[in-house]
């Protein structure tokens, strides 16, 4: 197991570092020579290395094959660099592509960047090294117009096939009022419907064999078992799945584009909608990344309050997941019990934040307000109620022989496959990999809590759902510690960029009154830099990679969600299985389409 004391997460959050002392920089220099790279100093907590386009695949292969390899392509996307003013010391670039690699054995990350000219937006595909680069490269091409040479199927993934332009370019409008009014004529509707017709040849599929034709079946985008606006086209021989093509993007809302026109403060409500069951869990990585940019260290009370709200939302999400999984297998009753239990969670959340699903309650430098009187009683009542209810779910449903017969050994994959496809959360831990960000890279004071990380052995549907049950128990354990050990102190940091600033000062000092007005109306100005924060969200690892150009809003907001990677893995897991197995597999993934499509 990796020595957690070596993790960069224990370094001061405000520290800008080039990470030249990281062993991987020495390894790269020894292999390729120090002149082959430009190392960028950031607040991401990892080495950020610009490499030559011609050497990119060689560098990635080298890192992939090291004794302690970088086994996961955690993220891949682009940046339009043309309007960036604070880029001194970096390679000249109109656009750039970044590759975020993760090593489990080292418990470390590295980010590779490639500079591109607007006249030559080409880079080689990484799909032969990391198969999960497929969807990320498709999205990067779609959003920026960067071509990945050798990609097996470089087509649109988020936007309709008829869409024109590349939305994340800086010269692409960010507001609907900048477009002509949209009119859907009958002719245009027919063309849009025709574009959705699945053509097997486009995906390298055969329509049949010499003796019989294959059936092509649309599951979704309005099927109850697809868990949202998600379409998956199945190639069937009888009920056996020969192959399938997931089709996403129906829930895309341009969340990353919105980050470029909202202030650092006013973007917080948008984070709640990324994974709409996660509530405050979604806000955590964003505010932590902004606080790294600002150099804010929050009081212990803020850390503990944030942990408490995050674990309440984790329980709320897990309850829905467990009960709907049971429903997908065929048992209806547990869903109704779960909504009773979730209401008790919402009672606590609503009393504290004033809202239920989308509280937008975390703030830059703190939380919106202090805990209300009586929060302890509400939390105590829930902690006394929930353990016995959880036992009843296990006894009445999850130990049922029919449920186990439908899920044990179904849609199983191993640790190597999970890492290759970017699987995180319970989906990865079900294969025996004990990687939980709260333990391995503690944030918001998680290092002060006593809890276990449940792991599985088989990597199948049953392991995944039972891990969620055990995670729910550990969340209750964390909440018990919040109840008993809530620190005293302020609910906001004493820092100039805390937003909004403490209200009590605004009527005493003209300086703070002006600051309050500017930060609420225009937004705080963050120092030019880059920051990154990953957290253990309800469905896997969620992260924000923020680029500030010294303005009141983000220059580039990259949101990496777990569900996107998990859906891309589906074909590799389900080929050769039955349609009924796919239904159970989809239920075991734990995804919502807002998390996929952003």
Swiss-Prot record:
Pfam families: Complex1_30kDa, Complex1_49kDa. Residues 213-598 are annotated as: NADH dehydrogenase I subunit D. It catalyses: a quinone + NADH + 5 H(+)(in) = a quinol + NAD(+) + 4 H(+)(out). It is a peripheral membrane protein. Keywords: Cell inner membrane, Cell membrane, Membrane, Multifunctional enzyme, NAD, Quinone, Translocase, Transport, Ubiquinone. Its main location: membrane. Residues 1-189 are annotated as: NADH dehydrogenase I subunit C. HAMAP family: NDH1_NuoC (MF_01357), NDH1_NuoCD_1 (MF_01359), NDH1_NuoD (MF_01358). This is NADH-quinone oxidoreductase subunit C/D. It comes from Yersinia pestis bv. Antiqua (strain Angola). The gene is nuoC.
């Amino acid at each position: 197991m990796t020595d957690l004391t070596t993790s960069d997460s224990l370094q001061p959050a405000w520290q800008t570092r080039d990470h030249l002392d990281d062993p991987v920089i020495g390894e790269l220099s020894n292999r390729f020579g120090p002149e082959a790279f430009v190392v960028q100093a950031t607040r991401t907590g990892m080495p950020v290395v610009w490499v030559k386009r011609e050497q990119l695949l060689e560098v990635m292969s080298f890192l992939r094959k090291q004794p302690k390899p970088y086994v996961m392509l955690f993220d891949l996307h682009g940046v339009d660099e043309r309007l960036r003013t604070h880029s001194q010391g970096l390679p000249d670039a109109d656009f750039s592509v970044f590759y975020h690699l993760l090593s489990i054995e080292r418990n470390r990350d590295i980010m590779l960047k490639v500079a591109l000219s607007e006249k030559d937006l080409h880079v080689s595909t990484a799909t032969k090294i990391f198969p999960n680069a497929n969807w990320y490269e498709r999205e990067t091409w779609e959003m920026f117009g960067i071509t990945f040479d050798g990609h097996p199927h470089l087509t649109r993934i988020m936007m309709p096939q008829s869409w024109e332009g590349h939305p994340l370019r800086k010269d692409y409008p960010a507001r609907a009022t900048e477009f002509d009014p949209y009119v859907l004529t009958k002719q245009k509707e027919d063309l849009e419907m025709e574009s959705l017709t699945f053509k097997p040849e486009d995906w390298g599929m055969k329509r049949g064999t010499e003796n019989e034709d294959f059936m092509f079946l649309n599951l979704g985008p309005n099927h109850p078992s697809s868990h949202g606006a998600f379409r998956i086209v199945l190639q069937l021989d009888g009920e056996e799945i020969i192959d399938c093509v997931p089709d996403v993007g129906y829930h895309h809302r341009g969340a990353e584009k919105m980050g470029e026109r909202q202030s650092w403060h006013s973007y917080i409500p948008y984070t709640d909608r990324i994974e709409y069951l996660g509530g405050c869990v979604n806000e955590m990585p964003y505010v932590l990344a902004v606080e790294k940019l600002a150099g804010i260290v929050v009081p212990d009370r803020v850390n503990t309050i944030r942990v408490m709200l995050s674990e309440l939302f984790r329980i709320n999400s897990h309850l829905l997941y467990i009960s709907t999984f049971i429903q997908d297998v065929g048992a209806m009753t547990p869903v109704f019990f779960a909504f009773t239990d979730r209401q008790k969670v919402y009672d606590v959340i609503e009393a504290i934040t004033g809202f239920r699903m989308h509280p937008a309650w975390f703030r830059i430098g703190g939380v919106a307000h202090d805990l209300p009187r009586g929060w302890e009683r509400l939390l105590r009542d829930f902690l006394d109620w929930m353990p016995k209810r959880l036992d009843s779910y296990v006894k009445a449903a999850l130990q049922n022989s029919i449920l186990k017969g439908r899920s044990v050994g179904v849609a199983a994959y191993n640790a190597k496959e999970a890492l290759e496809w970017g699987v995180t959360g319970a989906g990865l831990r079900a294969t025996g990999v004990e990687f939980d960000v709260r333990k391995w890279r503690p944030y918001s004071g998680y290092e002060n809590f006593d809890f276990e990380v449940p792991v599985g052995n088989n990597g199948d549907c049953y392991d995944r759902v039972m891990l969620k049950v055990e995670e729910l128990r550990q969340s209750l354990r964390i909440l018990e510690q919040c109840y008993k050990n809530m620190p005293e102190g302020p609910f906001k940091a004493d820092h100039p960029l805390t937003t909004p600033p403490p209200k009590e000062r605004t009527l005493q000092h003209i300086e703070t009154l002006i600051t309050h007005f500017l930060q609420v109306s225009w937004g705080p100005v963050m120092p030019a830099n880059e920051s990154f924060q990953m957290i253990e969200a309800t469905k896997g690892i969620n992260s924000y990679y923020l680029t500030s150009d010294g303005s009141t809003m983000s220059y580039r907001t990259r949101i990496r969600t777990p569900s996107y990677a998990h859906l891309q893995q589906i074909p590799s897991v389900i080929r050769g299985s039955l349609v009924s197995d796919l239904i159970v597999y989809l239920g075991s993934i734990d995804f919502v389409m807002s998390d996929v499509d952003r």
